Amino acid sequence: MDRERPRKTREPASPGSVLSKRSKLSRKSLALRSLNKFHPYKAPSSVRSLKKAHTLVSNGDFFNGISLNCEFGKDFLREMDTPICTSKVICLPLDVHEIAPGRCLVLSPLGHACNMGFYCEKCTQSGQNSYSQFQGRGGNAKMAAQNSKDDLHSVTLTFYNQVSKVVQNKNFYLSLLSHSLTTIKKSFVQPSLLYSYTVLRALCDDVFPIFKDTENGLCMFALFKTDDLHVSETCLRHLVDNLIHYRVTLDCVKHTYMLKFSPIRAEANGMTIQEVEICEAITGLDFTDEIKQEIISGQELVSEL
């Protein structure tokens, strides 16, 4: 008769043993699998289903929440590291007051676009220095050295510093003189015209002004003698923020880009200037054939509007 062998009983593992640690990990893993309904040998869910699982609110609810809670919307924008839209196609004519702050304009025969300034290569290369692009003829380099870029922030200060500089603003004054001496005196009560011309000379390409007398006052057309035009965000901000008495429109006529400054109300100019001396200096300027031809061509172009 065979004797029954006594069964060996497994002694419980001590709390610090390796077996005890493994058993705890296995129980924890089993609990996690049962909680998440995840099996290590089953195929994982699709990426689309995972994305749906993480979508807690709909797009409509999300944007409604942002519109109702401004602070939440600001926090969301701070977390964004990529702009939603860096470029937008535009059509001419265009009112520059409709352009959002921080954007520049790039115009060419291939198309026109409104870009974010910090995404624009030309704005980045210039460093947004108000006088870094000061170029052209007629004493522009000297003008850049003499003036502070803070002058462009004020219509009154810019007009006061520029009105007596007849030689530097020769094209501006000779274009006025082509009408009459009375037209020059009318421009003295519209300081925003000289201010606009100064800003464009400083921040844009070669520009020539043409004037037209209207019921509300003198209207200025700034003609750009270039096929490709870039208007920086700094230039646009100066024009939009300071020309409260004018409507500024960008247009293209016969492949010529132009900015139209139309007065909508009278300006208040209480500055005292030496009108007689300035007018005498203007009449003494050299009216070259080149300038005459530019004035004639510009007036013919403006007459078609």
Swiss-Prot record:
Organism encoding this protein: Equine herpesvirus 2 (strain 86/87)
Region: Disordered, residue numbers: 1-24
Similarity comment: family membership: Belongs to the herpesviridae NEC1 protein family.
Post-translational modification note: Phosphorylated at serine residues in the N-terminus. This phosphorylation regulates the localization within the inner nuclear membrane.
HAMAP family xrefs: HSV_NEC1
Protein name per the record: Nuclear egress protein 1
Top-level taxon: Viruses
GO MF: zinc ion binding
